[in-house]
Design a protein with these regions (language model features):
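Short, proline-centered helix/strand-breaking motifs
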Residues: 21-24, 113
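Short, charged, surface-exposed hinge/linker loops at domain edges
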Residues: 2-4, 45-111, 115-122
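A short beta-strand-loop micro-motif that forms or neighbors metal/cofactor-
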Residues: 122-129
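A short, exposed loop/beta-hairpin motif centered on an aromatic-Gly-Thr core
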Residues: 24-35, 109
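Surface loops and adjacent helix of pleckstrin homology
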Residues: 21, 31, 122
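A short, charged, amphipathic alpha-helix used as a generic interaction element across diverse proteins
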Residues: 32-49
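N-terminal segment of the canonical double-stranded RNA-binding domain
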Residues: 1-14, 19, 97-99
Length: 129
């Protein structure tokens, strides 16, 4: 299922800050616009996935016309000037993203100390899982 949330992309000296107003100041950043968008997708997917895993409620997305970015950003930046920004919708299929990035198994071969191996064998630890 596709999840779509509005995000504020704020132009900073070092790139872009991305803030999801509906998700309690959830934010990320990127040096370029492309990187900021990739990070926004990853951030949104990770947040929604974690909420699902912890069975926490997720706030529904606002309609873009209901947002009040100047007020919201002023609250974040305080006395600093609000940077140039734009609003865009960020979408992600959390299930598909999780399968590819969060739930994917990776085979690794590693060396452990002999004492740790003996202890694991004593406790019946399955090294395959």
């Amino acid at each position: 299922m596709l999840s779509i949330y509005p995000a504020y992309f704020c132009k900073e000296d070092s790139g872009y800050s991305v803030i999801f107003p509906d998700l309690n100041y959830l934010s990320t950043c990127g040096e370029t616009l492309e990187e900021a968008m990739e990070m926004a997708v990853d951030c949104l997917a990770g947040h929604l996935y974690l909420c699902r895993q912890l069975q926490e409620p997720v706030f529904p997305p606002s309609k873009p016309e209901a947002l009040r970015p100047e007020e919201y950003l002023k609250n974040i930046y305080g006395d600093l000037p609000v940077p140039d920004y734009f609003i865009t919708m960020v979408s992600v299929d959390v299930d598909a993203y999780a399968r590819e990035h969060f739930e994917k198994s990776v085979k690794k071969t590693l060396t452990i100390p002999a004492w740790l191996n003996q202890e694991a064998l004593k406790r019946g630890l399955n090294f395959s899982k």
